[in-house]
Amino acid sequence: MPVPANAIEAVFLTHAHIDHSGMLPKLCKDGFRGQIYATEATCNLCRIMLMDSAHIQESEAQWRTRKAERAGERAVEPVYDTNDAAAALRLLRPCQYNAAVQAAEGIIIRMTDIGHLLGSACIEVWLREDGVTKKLVFSGDVGNVNQPILRD
């Protein structure tokens, strides 16, 4: 990542799919200590998915290490482990849809339902600095054609 993990103050997670959430434990392993903002449903899904992913990482690394050692090569380390996943989970901050949340000094966010997955959100971010407010919007993935979602 081009920015040191310990220089990041907050992460805004649009949904739990592993291509969006899967490297959060690695971010923590690398020094991230900020907050991870997501909807409550996304937080709940991440609690399952990130621990499962960490177990897979550990098992895969053990298997590759056994194979590598037979070939006289170095042990393989997992990208992250269950301790890293647990660290990421402790940083999750559940947000309600349509509620304004102060994420940091001068930063307010609001998550709105975007219909992609249970708990998915479009994230509006208001940045206030020197009396000027700017609005940014992160869409994440949008919609899910012909796949109704039961509201959380």
Predicted regions located by residue number:
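His/Asp/Glu-rich metal-coordinating catalytic cores
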Residues: 1-12, 17-21, 27-152
